[in-house]
Structure formats: C-alpha cells, structure tokens
C-alpha cells in the first residue's frame, strides 16, 4: 500500500483519525500550506449566503477532487473485494443514495460527504473487523443524515480562503478551482463535531448495525480500538492530542457498550435479523 496521506473532514474528534503527521501530507505532489492561503475578512464571511443547492454542488466537486488526488482502490484488489462484500447490497440509506470507496492510505479514518459518498481509509480496514468497519460507516452516514456534514462543509467554506478566491463579495458561489478545493480540504481537516453530534452519530451507527444484522457490539469495539490507539500514540502526536482534547470519548465507549448490553438484557430483546 502506498504511504499516501490525505486531509478529510475530522470525522471523529472521536470516531476516526489519522496517526500520521500532516506535515508529510501531499496532494498531487504538492504540499498544502494553509498559512499561505489568503483569508477573507469577517465582513465578507457574514455577507456570503450558501443555499442547500450550493452545498450540494460543492460536495460533488469536493468528492471529485478527493477521488482524483487520493489513491482510490480498484474493484479487483483485496480492499476492493472486501468493500464489495461489505457494501455491495447497500445502495440507499434513509433516502440517501450512497456510494463507497477505499483510499489506499495508511490513515485510520473514514468520512461521508453530503452527496452520499462514503470513503474508508485502508488503514482503518487493516485494524478493524468487517462489522467494526460497518459501524464506522454507519456513524459517518449518520453525520450526513443529521446534516452535520453539510454544516461542516458550509462552515469550512466560510472559514477558508476559498471564499476570497471564489468571490467573497458576490452573492453566488462560483465553481471551485483545484487550489480552492485544497484550501477547503485544509479547513475540513480542522473541523470538529460537537459531543452531541458525535453521540447522535454513534447511536445512528449502532442502529445501522442492528438493521443490517451486524454485531451490536461493533460500535463499542470500533470506538474502543480507537481509544486504545490514542493511548499508544506518541504524547505529542496529532492523534493523541485529538483524543486528549475530547475527554468524553471514554464515556462514548462505555455508552456504546451499555446500549449493546441492554439489547440482550431487555425483557423483550429486539430482533436483530435486519427487520425493524
């Protein structure tokens, strides 16, 4: 597997994150330095209004850019075959048409975008079981269903230098250039979901597992693995810092385990055959 690194929405400030240093990160052979990106002023940010249509178009452009600048695995690879086995029968989730892909990068990460694109890093697939991978997928789809991803995309656009280059003084959003999409990727990499959003996404991931007849403990196991990884990571690493800044992660792990336990201790256990 190629040692590529990529910037994506910070999907877990508790769920999944990279163990590698972003200083090594390159896109298309070029290092991205957000400090060199021109920032528009506060007044310009307030002046921009983004519609749902703008966000949808932006999400599509963003995913096309991400798939171009990251090594998307082919169907005949081990990762491609495993992905097909896990997601081949999932075409739509709660009205959202979804498509899946694997980036052959070593990051332990995954994310979903507002256009229904779900991308999983090979690094995450390497350390997790099939059910755990799907729990993470359910969590990420939950962020989209709850509009967390759409809000993150909007906020990243407003915070990034994209707004300056794309016309901060204009009331409309123009098609984004390659450099502007790179700047947005930087902004999305620094995005963080609230604890409430993460907990709700955990719940969605849990229900996703139940609906698809997967291990009810998969969400707990996935979260617990990530928590253990953070404990093993170097003290000053980005991975460790991310988890240390979210002390409630351990509570999320415990909560996920409790939900799975309750499924079996309830007087009328739920049928986990996939019907609801």
Briefly describe each language-model feature range.
Residues 1, 13, 270-272:
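Intrinsic disorder/low-complexity segments
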Residues 1-7:
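Bacterial N-terminal signal peptides that target proteins for export
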Residues 8-9, 273:
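Residues marking helix boundaries in flexible regions
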Residues 9-16:
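Bacterial N-terminal signal peptides
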Residues 14, 224, 273-275:
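N-terminal processing/targeting junctions
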Residues 20-266:
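A Zn2+-metalloprotease active-site environment signal
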Residues 264-276:
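Single conserved hydrophobic/aromatic residue that forms the stacking wall/gate
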